[in-house]
Every structure is written in structure tokens, then in C-alpha cells.
Regions:
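Catalytic centers of hydrolytic enzymes
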Residues: 1-219
């Protein structure tokens, strides 16, 4: 029956998630609460963004970003199933790629930080990029110290006039969560579902989570 097929798909092991340095093999949630992904870097967000960047690896994208509200439930260590992935990210989002100037990227990060005090879902989780956010500052002036990964693997400050190839999902690209500026960008639709990128990224090799260092919250 269809229900039985669905159950077997949901129970299908995909791969493993490991915490760097933890050899116990026990199953623990990557964060206490998915709501954390709306106010800080979170390990589940790191894995989701790394999978997005990995899914876009043949496009030349060097940065991935998407809204923290995408994380509906924490991922956990140990063996993860398709059902676990769908619980974490129960959305039909697809991967898109576009070219943004540094100025546009900064604008997106500022918009992401603009609803910080309300824990708004638009707060951006990232890969290939690091930034600081100071919630006490006025909206539009909260983001600083933005760095991007270079092709050589180092880091350099974001340059306003430089152009960066960015991977995100169609939801944000089409102006979801108030990202109206994204509607002006020419996005390339890959047709790849983010959930499939996540599945394949975890399936190819155990994912070792080393959280920290992407987003600094300044108090």
C-alpha cells in the first residue's frame, strides 16, 4: 500500500551526523530548540547551509544562505533517516543560484537581522560567509565584520562592489520573509530540492558538525 511505501521511505537510513570530538556515538539533538536558529548560528543551520552549498558545487557558488525559520526541529547525531530530515525541514524548497554584489549581500544580512528581537524566522544561517550582528543597534546597522571564503580556502572582508555567486532557496529568492530585494536578482533555478541536497550530502560521508565561528552575536 501507499502508506506502507511511505513508512519504509521515512524509516530509510540516510547517513550519519557526528559531533566533532564526540566518540560516544550517543544520539543527541544538535541544539536544544530549533528557535535558536532564528537568533544565532545553530548546528542544524550549519548542516543545512553546507548541504545547500554542496548541492550548488557545480555552479560556482561560494556562499549559501537561507532563513533560520527553515529549521523546524533540530537534527540529531547518529544515524538519521529521511523522516528525520523531513521533520527538520518540511518544505518543498528548491535550490537557486544568483550573482549578488557585496552591497546586496550586506543588505540581505541586515534584513535577516531586522526582526532579531522578535525571533523572526528571516535571520540568515550561512555557509562560506561569516558575520557579526549587534541586536541593540538600529535596524539596518546591525551587521558588521562580514567575511567571505576565498577560492584558496582563506577568508577576506566582503567588498561592496565585488560580485559573489550565492546559493539560496526559491522561497527567499521570490521575496519570502520580506526579502523583496531578492526579486530583482536573476536567479538560476536548478530544479534540485534542498531536501535532496541535504539527503545526498549526509549520505556521501558522515557529516562532522563543528559549530561556531560563522555568526557572532555582539551584546
Amino acid at each position: 500500500s501507499y502508506a506502507a511505501q511511505l513508512r519504509s521511505l521515512i524509516g530509510q537510513p540516510v547517513g550519519k551526523i557526528l559531533l566533532a570530538g564526540d566518540t560516544s556515538g550517543r544520539q543527541v539533538d544538535l541544539e536544544e530548540d530549533a528557535h535558536l536558529c532564528r537568533v544565532q548560528e545553530c548546528p542544524s543551520g550549519d548542516v543545512l547551509m553546507d548541504s545547500l552549498l554542496w548541492g550548488a558545487r557545480d555552479t560556482g557558488a561560494t556562499v549559501a544562505l537561507s532563513v533560520g525559520g527553515t529549521v523546524r526541529s533540530p537534527l540529531h547525531t547518529g544515524v538519521v533517516t529521511m523522516g528525520d530530515l523531513l521533520t527538520t525541514m518540511p518544505f518543498d524548497n528548491t535550490l537557486v543560484v544568483g550573482d549578488l554584489t557585496g552591497k546586496q549581500l550586506l543588505g540581505a544580512l541586515e534584513h535577516g537581522a531586522s526582526g532579531y528581537e522578535n525571533g523572526a524566522g528571516r535571520f540568515l544561517q550561512v555557509a562560506g560567509l561569516t558575520y557579526s550582528v549587534e541586536p541593540a543597534k538600529p535596524v539596518g546597522q546591525r551587521v558588521s565584520a562580514v567575511s567571505v571564503r576565498t577560492k584558496a580556502g582563506g577568508w577576506e572582508p566582503l567588498r561592496p562592489e565585488a560580485v559573489y555567486r550565492v546559493a539560496t532557496v526559491d522561497y527567499a529568492a521570490e521575496g519570502g520573509d520580506g526579502f523583496a530585494a531578492f526579486k530583482k536578482i536573476k536567479w538560476q533555478y536548478t530544479g534540485r530540492a534542498h531536501i535532496e541536497c541535504l539527503r545526498d550530502y549526509i549520505a556521501k560521508a558522515p557529516v562532522e558538525v563543528r559549530s561556531g565561528g560563522r555568526i557572532k552575536v555582539l551584546r
